[in-house]
Amino acid sequence: MIKVSNYIQTAFSMEDAAALVPIIDAKLNTNSNVVLDFSGIKFFTTLFFNNAITKYVLSLGPEEYKKKFKLINLSEVGRTTYEHSLTNANSYYELSDDKRKIEEMIISETLEDNLN
C-alpha cells in the first residue's frame, strides 16, 4: 500500500502528480496491485488525478486499470473529483484512433491559445 501523505501533502498540482508517479511506477514494475491510501489528504483537482493516476487507464486499458488500482480513504470531494477524472479517461480511451488524434489536436491548439 502507498500512503500518499508520505510523499505529498495535497493532490492538487502537477508537482504533486510528478512526485507520486515514480512511486506508482515502481509498484507497477513489481507486477503488484496499486493501493493508494489518501488519508490525511484534503485538497484535490482533476489535474492531479489525470496526471498521477487515471493516465494509467490509457496505458493499461480500463479493465487492467480496474484490476490493478484501488484508492482508499478519499474524502467525498476527493472521490467525486477522482470519478470525474476516471470517467474522462475511460471515455477518451474508447475514442477511435482518428477521433483521438483530432481531440489531441484540439487540446494542443487550446493550450497554445491559452498560453499565448
Regions found by a protein language model. Give the residues of each.
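STAS-like cytosolic regulatory interaction modules
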Residues: M1-V35, K42, T54-N116
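Residues at alpha-helix caps and immediate loop-helix transition turns in enzyme cores, especially N-
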Residues: D16, F48-F49
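Acidic, metal-coordinating catalytic cores used for nucleic-acid/nucleotide bond scission
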Residues: G40-F48
